[in-house]
Curated annotation (Swiss-Prot):
PANTHER family: DIMETHYLADENOSINE TRANSFERASE (PTHR11727), DIMETHYLADENOSINE TRANSFERASE-RELATED (PTHR11727:SF7). This is Ribosomal RNA small subunit methyltransferase A. One of its GO terms (cellular component) is cytosol. Its EC number is 2.1.1.182. Keywords: Cytoplasm, Methyltransferase, RNA-binding, rRNA processing, S-adenosyl-L-methionine, Transferase. It comes from Pectobacterium atrosepticum (strain SCRI 1043 / ATCC BAA-672) (Erwinia carotovora subsp. atroseptica). The keyword Methyltransferase applies. GO terms for molecular function: 16S rRNA (adenine(1518)-N(6)/adenine(1519)-N(6))-dimethyltransferase activity; RNA binding.
Length: 272
């Protein structure tokens, strides 16, 4: 039997589809999410409903976002879910989550077993809506979770670490082996909880500056900051801002990156 076929559906590589089928893992994720009736719950990529069905047992209504038209059609006909679901057949990268929260009249609780080929850009998309989100629970490649929670002075600390920690508190929930899926991915997975900060610990006046600085620094992570950020800051400015010019991108804390971003916002002439 083709191991890409599960419950009569052929897993599509272009959508990065791996379907969760381990009941212990499913129960653990649902318990971690702990959805309550009346909350504005949104699932990204429900697939064959491994999480959708048990979440549906606890909810009167909730929303799912599914790009695959065949899977969306299955959910529309699901005997116990069809009357509970608002199905949005659309790419989650194009969704206005602030509009969904406004329609719901409350912040969203977002969860999903994210396709690994879009998980990082999708999280960056969601970070722009954190004021409209209460929390997020995602199944991700374990390596991505390691990057999310990484601290400075580690090889896994990167732009994703800085931007995620700027917006959210990040809590690993559980690790998931490949055999919990069909077809089994070639990597380990993990579930993570992201809770947007009620108040940003290190607010920046222009998030584009933080994005630009972290992109330039980590795209040249083996260079010293004197070189990787040389087109934005003089060595003297870096020193005045408390940055060691001989350090590298992974040696700088989230707070220090935010300090750099705010300085750059206040000195627009330096951005040329």
């Amino acid at each position: 039997m083709n191991n890409r076929v599960h419950q009569g559906h052929f897993a599509r590589k272009r959508f990065g589809q791996n379907f969760l089928n381990d009941h212990f893992v499913i129960d653990s994720i649902v318990s971690a999410i702990h959805p309550q009736p009346g909350q504005a719950v949104v699932e990204i990529g429900p697939g064959l409903g491994a999480l959708t069905a048990p979440i549906g047992e606890r909810m009167d209504r909730f929303t799912v976002i599914e790009l695959d038209r065949d899977l969306a059609a299955r959910l529309e006909k699901h005997p116990t879910l069809k009357d509970k679901l608002t199905i949005i057949q659309q790419d989650a990268m194009t969704i206005d989550f602030a509009a969904l929260a406004e329609q719901a009249g409350q912040p969203l609780r977002v969860f999903g077993n994210l396709p690994y080929n879009i998980s990082t850009p999708l999280m960056f998309h969601l970070f722009t809506y954190t004021q409209s989100i209460r929390d997020m629970h995602f199944m991700l490649q374990k390596e991505v979770v390691n990057r999310l929670v990484a601290g400075p002075n580690s090889k896994t600390f990167g732009r994703l670490s800085v931007m995620a920690q700027y917006y959210c508190q990040i809590i690993p929930v559980l690790e998931v082996p490949p055999e919990a899926f069909k077809p089994a991915p070639k990597v380990d997975s993990a579930v993570v909880r992201l809770v947007p900060h009620a108040e940003l610990p290190y607010p920046v006046s222009d998030i584009r500056m933080l994005s630009r600085i972290t992109t330039e620094a980590f795209n040249q992570r083996r260079k010293t900051l004197r070189n990787s950020l040389g087109n934005l800051f003089t060595p003297e400015t870096l020193t005045e801002l408390g940055i060691n010019i001989t350090s590298r991108a992974e040696n700088v804390t989230v707070e220090q990156y935010c300090r750099l971003a705010n300085w750059l916002s206040e000195h627009p002439a330096k951005q040329e």
